[in-house]
Amino acid sequence: KFSKTIHTSVRMLDNVLDVTAWPLEQQRKEAMAKRRVGLGFTGLGDALAMLRLRYDTDEARAMAAKISAAMRDEAYRASANLAKERGAFPLFNGDMYLSGGNFASRLPAELKQKIREQGIRNSHLLSIAPTGTISLAFADNASNGIEPPFSWTYTRKKRMADGNLQEFPVEDHAW
């Protein structure tokens, strides 16, 4: 299921590039030339907690690395599949893309071979960004991004449409 979700997410993020109303033509050209997307995490800290792994332990770091590697590999596999279907990003050069010293050069051999043969749809695929608001709004209060929960409960201040601040209690649901 994780693999399928990643493939769906990469396809959706690639589709967003095509339907975005870019404010400037220069922005559209840049987006189309590189087709950068940013698949990332929310709730990793809570996932580790639900697996009964303390965030600051070797076991938790090993699990986080395993999850991250699976997400990375499936995202690159999905983008290579999209390249076969829709074409590689216009600036793609396989030798340069897979050369030593960059992120793609550290991919597993089978993925590098797939990219050599099919190309890759998106120049960049992963983004580990802060996801506080997204975690609260769309992930039922999951922990932010790759971070552990800083508190099981806290108060969040939100500016309302009339300009006033209102406080809301927030509870991490993985607890």
List where the protein language model places each region.
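Long, C-terminal-biased catalytic regions of enzyme "large/alpha" subunits
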Residues: 1-175
